[in-house]
């Protein structure tokens, strides 16, 4: 009992003493109503996109409010989600077509066997978004290397899956159509063929895929949840989550986040 009590005391100390969590981002100044914490119009709009259940809806998994004990927002609800991230061919383990990382169902874990109907297969933990703009790899397999591309995946995973997943069959166009975006993992446009959506998840677990906005399973080539302005504003807001001594991987262009 004494050992458990000592652990609880240490936990309380680490939660309450600011030296263990010296949050110094612009967002922290904003919520603390401190000097330097005034969000620009673009950042404020980005916060609205972040929280909008019909827009970015980022807050559904990356909760931006204080904890139950009043602790500073960690920008994660510590939940697990399956969102069908594309397979990363650059990983040596993926040279084996039979290898699949099922997250909670292994192979690194053994407490959730990958049996049909297991709703945990394909799920990975929602990470904190603090200092997210400083990262150069995203998701469990590091498939994306920019924050903007990651946001665009969320926005068009369902509306333009051909940008993110391989197409089987069909004929490659020598020159893509002018309206074919160049920001995806797949830069070749195909006529015909079948898009292998969720190519890193066995078909028996596709039912575990998250269907919350913006990943709501809307029809292909329909209007995506976020506009270009929404994406730009959201990027501006996410940059406010970097602590003052942390440099962004891709700093916003001068003036991009001011108005």
Each PLM stretch: what is its role?
Residues 1-259:
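Periplasmic c-type cytochrome electron-transfer domains
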